């Protein structure tokens, strides 16, 4: 496996593969890899001849300096895992490589509307940081296809929209969330939980499934449903941060025409912010007039 931290040698290798007619898949990560990331890698392998991964903790997408400082960095272990998965190349740039003039002078990519609603409303600038770094990585790696986890549902929607708006020639593949045996969505942040917190963490997924069952049973008083779910989280000493019920296609409020909804949840467990989501199939709305 090739490991590059500089842009130029990476580009030369990519060009060589392209000349050979190779199809290239890309998996951008922030490191601290777990089974969820490795599932992205395996999915990428199914879509291409060459798999490229990146490991870069992107400072532009962090609102909280402590969160950036405390984010787990395990480069040696990550490289071992990627080697075991037969990844062809890993790109490990520093902030100085990605942002040579500093964040203040970096040209940014801002996807309107979707970057400022839901999680974007409470984390201003976060999604601009995501879209900027992903766009830059796409320009560096020039992939044919890129794989992203559905756990970060709004992020996936943002990237799909950016690809459309910027006319990028990249196929975006969403990969279902990978979960622990107890239902907790796999995340690098899970490593920051204490043993006691880890035991309580699955309450987030259980509460989400409870909301889903209520919705599939016909309950549509969403504000009351969200408050009931918040109470369940508080009872387990989780602090609700965000709970949204939206149309899965538009990320707007559900309407009578909504047939597929998405539950988006975030809660603090101690100092760790956990996120999760679940798609809910609703009874199809009928617009047919009675004969």
Curated annotation (Swiss-Prot):
Quote the subcellular location field of this record. Cytoplasm
List all disulphide bridges recorded for this chain. Answer: none
Q: What is its EC number?
A: 6.3.2.1
Any one Gene Ontology molecular-function term assigned to this protein's record: ATP binding
Keyword Hydrolase assigned: no
The terms describing its cellular component in GO are: cytosol
Explain the purpose of this protein. Catalyzes the condensation of pantoate with beta-alanine in an ATP-dependent reaction via a pantoyl-adenylate intermediate.
Q: Which family does it belong to?
A: Belongs to the pantothenate synthetase family.
Oligomeric state and interaction partners are given as: Homodimer.
What protein does this entry describe? Pantothenate synthetase
Origin organism is Aliivibrio fischeri (strain ATCC 700601 / ES114) (Vibrio fischeri)
Q: Which gene encodes it?
A: panC
């Amino acid at each position: 496996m090739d490991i590059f931290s500089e842009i130029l040698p990476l580009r030369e290798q990519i060009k060589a593969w392209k000349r050979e007619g190779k199809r290239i898949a890309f998996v951008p990560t922030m490191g601290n890899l777990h089974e969820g990331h490795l599932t992205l890698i395996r999915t990428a392998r199914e879509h291409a001849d060459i798999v490229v991964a990146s490991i870069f903790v992107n400072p532009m997408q962090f609102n909280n300096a402590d969160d950036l400082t405390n984010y787990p960095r395990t480069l040696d272990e990550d490289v071992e895992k990627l080697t075991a998965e037969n990844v062809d190349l890993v790109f490990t740039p520093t902030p100085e490589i990605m942002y040579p003039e500093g964040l203040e002078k970096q040209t940014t990519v801002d996807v309107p509307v979707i970057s400022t609603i839901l999680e974007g409303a409470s984390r201003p600038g976060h999604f601009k940081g995501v879209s900027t770094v992903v766009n830059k990585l796409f320009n560096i790696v020039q992939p044919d296809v890129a794989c992203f986890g559905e756990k970060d549902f709004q992020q996936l929607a943002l990237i799909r929209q950016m690809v459309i708006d910027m006319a990028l020639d990249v196929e975006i593949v969403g990969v279902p969330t990978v979960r622990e045996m107890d239902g907790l969505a796999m995340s690098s942040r899970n490593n920051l939980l204490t043993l006691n917190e880890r035991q309580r963490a699955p309450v987030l997924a259980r509460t989400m499934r409870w909301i889903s069952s209520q919705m599939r049973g016909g309950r549509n008083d969403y504000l009351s449903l969200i408050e009931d779910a918040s109470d369940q989280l508080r009872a387990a000493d989780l602090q609700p941060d965000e709970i949204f019920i939206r149309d899965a296609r538009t990320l707007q409020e559900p309407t009578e025409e909504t047939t597929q909804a998405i539950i988006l949840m975030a809660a603090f467990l101690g100092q760790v912010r956990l996120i999760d989501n679940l798609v809910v199939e609703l009874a199809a709305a009928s617009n047919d007039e009675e004969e």
